[in-house]
Amino acid sequence: MNLSVEIGKIKLKNPVITASGTFGFGREYSEYIDLNKLGAIVVKGLTVKPREGNPPPRLFETASGILNSIGLQNPGVDAFIERELPFLKSFDVPVIVNIAGETVEEFVYMAEKLDIEGIEGIEINVSCPNVKKGGMAFGVNPDDIFDITRKVRKATSKTVIVKLTPNVTDIKVCAKAAEKGGADAISLINTVAGMAVDIDKRRPVFENVIGGLSGPAIKPIALKMVYEVVTVVSIPVIGMGGIMNYKDALEFLIVGARAIAVGTCNFVNPYCTVEIIDGIKKYMEENEIEDINEIIGSIKI
Amino acid sequence: MKARVLSNRGIASSVYEMTFEWKGKKPHPGQFLMIDCQGKTFLKRPFSVNDFEEEKMTILYQVRGEGTKNLSQMKEGDILEITGPHGNGFEILEGKRVLIVGGGVGIAPLLYLAKKVKAQKLYIALGFKRETFLVEKFEGLGEVVVTTEEGSTGRKGLVTSVVEEMIGEVDIVYGCGPKPMLKALQEISMKANVLCQISLEEKMACGIGACLGCACKVREDKGFSYKRVCRDGPVFWAEEVLF
Ligand SMILES: Cc1cc2nc3c(=O)[nH]c(=O)nc-3n(C[C@H](O)[C@H](O)[C@H](O)COP(=O)(O)OP(=O)(O)OC[C@H]3O[C@@H](n4cnc5c(N)ncnc54)[C@H](O)[C@@H]3O)c2cc1C
Ligand SMILES: Cc1cc2nc3c(=O)[nH]c(=O)nc-3n(C[C@H](O)[C@H](O)[C@H](O)COP(=O)(O)O)c2cc1C
Ligand code: FES
């Protein structure tokens, strides 16, 4: 049975990836699962300098999901290379690094720094605020997406993945901009912007007011966006958003995602990624499917 | 891991004690478990180890919302999904004069601590609003003082007043309870230059240190940083914490 898929130059043993920010740098989960079993690991979003993140509370449970306002807490790109990468290198699993710049130059700087052994791919997180343009996310502007992708593409020999935000009017335009900029793949969706209010204090739950919604609550939105994107680009798409089990994963694959990423579910069940891989295998056995690629994009409309 | 409920009973208004079979790792005092409370809850909920002996785990919990309400309705034989024990737990320094301080349902982790603390002399101060619970289980483990806000049982006032009186006679203080109480413990212990460990609470998602959702502010040489309550804590040296 073949479960392996290709994303740019990266060969994945299976299509199950961990979503950025939900798997740390792999350390914690290595106590629960064998990291070697994963298709790939995408690490927590990195910035040029270390970031402390937002004050608590940073989490709020909603109906079938969570709102988060972590604020990109991370040790910075240098500390990642020094302290976290050696650990990840000890496993036989492709490492994809998620980068979040505040300027185009910062994205390029990080892409160059991370063009080293032990890293297979760069995932550009365009959902962060563009400080030069008054804090609006890069990801809502197709010209910005094109520009960052093109410059990062030039700065690295690694597979370049552009991660799109769902908080836009037309995700297809953003996907096309990434493809035109030279992306090897597109991943989506990042969290859906949301809000919660404390009725006793009559204040937003988060100091930042707005948070990012993830988990099963966003799965139908994610699936629809992946479906839309695969119809307009020819590069591979990594689908994510609310995947909780192998059935959810299969929905994304059937719609046309070449691989899937599991995020919030890791918090609920630290074994879920491996369980999803096993579930996909079982489904293939039961349906006598030899190659995962027979499933990908097999939706009949 | 699956765990079978052995008993679940109310011991005060909206406070319950639940025991279940435990075949997992032996806990250290101050560690906690993440329990799937089922129903409409999505994330697991953190609960301290209240007691543990030979494959039998006990938690003490207060009904706060959906999750704890669901828990309170569980019966013998029901199956729970649990991960843990998580977190660092209290650092036990043998042969010291110890003061354990609990406020409300914050006394939960302190019973198991009191049993394992190996003190030269053990004082236990338990503070409640009105209704007291679990006090009898602490009797015999050390010298117990109880306070209630109106003086309905034990001494009248806040448990921290007991701490103020006794701080000169102890080497280390361990505390768990509401934030104002922990803040007072920090002030009293720092002023008296006595070691103090406190157990903090924050909303949690993963419980294992990956999501960075459970941040608490701690002092650093220059400024501050955020640590993870679930992994770096839940127990911190009081002087580190920035409330
Ligand atoms: C390390 C740790 C150990 C804990 N040990 C115990 C224990 O032994 N016994 C016990 O009764 N409770 C304990 N708690 C608190 C307990 O986890 C919460 O009361 C519980 O998650 C509430 O769930 P719920 O679904 O009933 O309420 P929700 O509907 O989720 O919330 C109801 C109320 O509880 C508050 N709350 C929710 N989650 C937390 C949390 N993680 N910490 C503090 N307050 C919260 C909410 O702000 C809200 O006001 C502990 C918390 C932590 C972080
Ligand atoms: C706590 C948390 C932190 C996240 N951090 C990042 C991040 O640093 N970079 C990023 O691109 N996406 C981040 N995400 C988004 C996820 O990678 C994923 O796109 C989103 O949560 C949807 O998938 P899910 O529903 O399976 O979680 C984060 C999500 C959560 C819940
Ligand atoms: S709850 Fe996820 S890091 Fe602490």
UniProtKB/Swiss-Prot annotation, chain A:
Chain sites annotated for binding FMN: S20, K44, G45, N98, N125, K163, I189, G215, G241, G242, G263, T264
Annotated catalysed reactions: (S)-dihydroorotate + NAD(+) = orotate + NADH + H(+)
Annotated pathway: Pyrimidine metabolism; UMP biosynthesis via de novo pathway; orotate from (S)-dihydroorotate (NAD(+) route): step 1/1
One of the record's GO molecular function terms: dihydroorotate dehydrogenase (NAD+) activity
GO annotation terms (biological process): 'de novo' pyrimidine nucleobase biosynthetic process; 'de novo' UMP biosynthetic process
CDD domains listed in its UniProt record: DHOD_1B_like
Pfam families listed in its UniProt record: DHO_dh
InterPro entries given in the database record: Aldolase_TIM, DHO_dehydrogenase, DHOD_1B, Dihydroorotate_DH_1, Dihydroorotate_DH_1_2, Dihydroorotate_DH_cat, Dihydroorotate_DH_CS, Dihydroorotate_DH_I
Stored SUPFAM superfamilies: FMN-linked oxidoreductases
Subcellular location: Cytoplasm
Cofactor(s) of this protein: FMN
Its EC number(s): 1.3.1.14
EC class (word): oxidoreductase
Keywords: Cytoplasm, Flavoprotein, FMN, NAD, Oxidoreductase, Pyrimidine biosynthesis
Database matches in NCBIfam families: PRK07259.1, pyrD_sub1_fam
Subunit text: Heterotetramer of 2 PyrK and 2 PyrD type B subunits.
Protein name (Swiss-Prot/TrEMBL): Dihydroorotate dehydrogenase B (NAD(+)), catalytic subunit
Lineage, top ranks: Bacteria, Bacillati, Bacillota, Clostridia, Thermoanaerobacterales
Gene this protein is translated from: pyrD
